[in-house]
Regions:
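Glycine-rich phosphate- or other oxyanion-binding loops that anchor nucleotides, phosphorylated ligands
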Residues: 42-289
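N-terminal beta1-alpha1 ligand-phosphate binding loop
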Residues: 16-37
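Extreme N-terminal starter segment of soluble prokaryotic enzymes
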Residues: 11-18, 55
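Short amphipathic alpha-helical "recognition" segments used for binding
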Residues: 7, 30, 280-282
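A short, well-structured beta->alpha microelement
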Residues: 2-5, 38-47
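Short, low-complexity, intrinsically disordered N-terminal peptides in bacterial proteins
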Residues: 1-14, 287-289
Length: 289
C-alpha cells in the first residue's frame, strides 16, 4: 500500500506540521501520537500523514544530505503549503547528563563547512536552548558544551526555503553523554525517550500552531485581489508586483477596499503605479515601503 485514502498527491493539502525525522524509532511515537498513516513507502523516504490532525512526516535516514533531500521530497510529494512549520526532532549527544532532557537548538553549526543557522523563534517558556553541532560521524568526545547530531544542518539549509526561518524548528532529546555511551542506545531506548516528552512536544506544537495561523493569514489572497487579477488579466510578473503593492497599500489604508470603478480603463501597470503613488504619499511607517 503506497497511499492512504483521502491523501491525493496532486492536491494542495493543509498540513500545519512537517516532520523530518532521521530514524524510524524516533518517528514511531510521533506517528502513533498524531494518528499518521503510510502515504508513500515505495521510495527512499517513507512518508506518513494525517490531514485531519495536520501532520506529515518523512523518515530521512542518517546524514545531513539525506535530511535535506527528504525534506524536499516531502514538500514536493504532498505539495506542502508555504505557511507550514518544519520540525526536525530526534536524539542527540550532549556534553552533560542527564539523558532524556529536551532542548531547542537555537544555533545549528555544520562541523564540516562551519556554516551556522539560527532556526525558529525561541520557545523559552517551554524548552531550554542549546547550540547544536552537526557532525558527519558519531561524536564521542563531547568537546563543546553543545548538542551533537548528524542531520540538523542539512535540514536547516533547506527547510526555511519551503516556509520561513521563523517556522523552522530543531528539537533534540539527549540520548548519550560522557557518562552514557552512544553504544548503549537501542531502538527501545530511543522510542522511550521521545514518548516521555510527548506532552511537552504537544505544548510546543500549540505555540507553533499560533505562528502557523498567523503566517497563513499573512499569505492569504483577498477576494478583491483575485477579482482584479481576473478582470485585468495580469501577467505573472505583474501579478507578483500587484500583490506586493496591495499588501503595502492595505497596511497604509486598512479600512479601504479597492474600488473597481476607479480602474475600469486602466492597464495592470497603471493600477500598480497608482497604488504605489498612494502608498508613497500616505505611508506613515517607512517599514511599509
Amino acid at each position: 500500500m503506497s497511499k492512504v485514502t483521502g491523501v491525493e498527491n496532486n492536491s494542495k493539502l493543509r498540513f500545519k506540521f512537517c516532520w523530518v525525522i532521521a530514524l524510524r524509532a524516533e518517528a514511531a511515537p510521533l506517528i502513533d501520537a498524531f494518528n499518521m498513516k503510510i502515504v508513500e513507502n515505495k521510495s527512499l523516504f517513507p512518508i506518513y500523514a494525517n490531514e485531519e490532525t495536520g501532520h506529515a512526516l518523512v523518515i530521512s535516514g542518517m546524514g545531513s544530505i539525506k535530511s535535506a533531500a527528504a525534506a524536499t521530497f516531502l514538500k514536493n510529494h504532498l505539495k506542502i503549503n508555504d505557511y507550514s512549520a518544519w520540525i526536525n526532532l530526534g536524539i542527540a549527544g550532549f556534553f552533560k547528563d542527564p539523558i532524556g532532557d529536551m532542548y531547542q537548538a537555537n544555533k545549528v553549526v555544520s562541523k564540516e563547512s562551519g556554516t551556522a543557522f539560527f532556526p525558529g523563534l525561541r520557545l523559552s517558556k517551554l524548552v531550554p536552548a542549546a547550540i547544536l553541532f552537526t557532525v558527519s560521524k558519531p561524536e564521542n568526545g563531547y568537546k563543546e558544551k553543545a548538542l551533537y547530531d548528524m542531520e540538523a544542518a542539512g535540514f536547516c539549509e533547506m527547510a526555511p526555503s519551503f516556509s520561513c526561518n521563523e517556522l523552522t524548528y530543531v528539537i533534540k532529546i539527549v540520548s548519550d553523554t560522557p557518562n552514557a555511551s552512544s553504544s548503549l542506545i537501542t531502538k527501545h531506548l530511543v522510542r522511550e525517550l521521545i514518548e516521555k516528552q510527548l506532552s511537552k512536544i504537544s505544548a510546543i506544537l500549540s505555540e507553533i500552531e499560533i505562528l502557523v495561523e498567523d503566517e497563513k493569514k499573512r499569505l492569504s489572497i483577498p477576494n478583491e485581489v483575485l477579482e482584479f487579477e481576473k478582470r485585468f488579466k495580469f501577467t505573472e510578473t505583474n501579478k507578483y508586483k500587484f500583490r506586493e503593492i496591495y499588501r503595502k497599500w492595505k497596511v497604509t489604508f486598512p479600512s479601504r477596499n479597492l474600488d473597481l470603478s476607479e480602474f475600469l480603463n486602466s492597464k495592470p501597470k497603471e493600477i500598480i503605479l497608482k497604488l504605489e503613488k498612494e502608498v508613497l504619499a500616505n505611508a506613515k511607517d517607512w517599514n511599509v515601503l
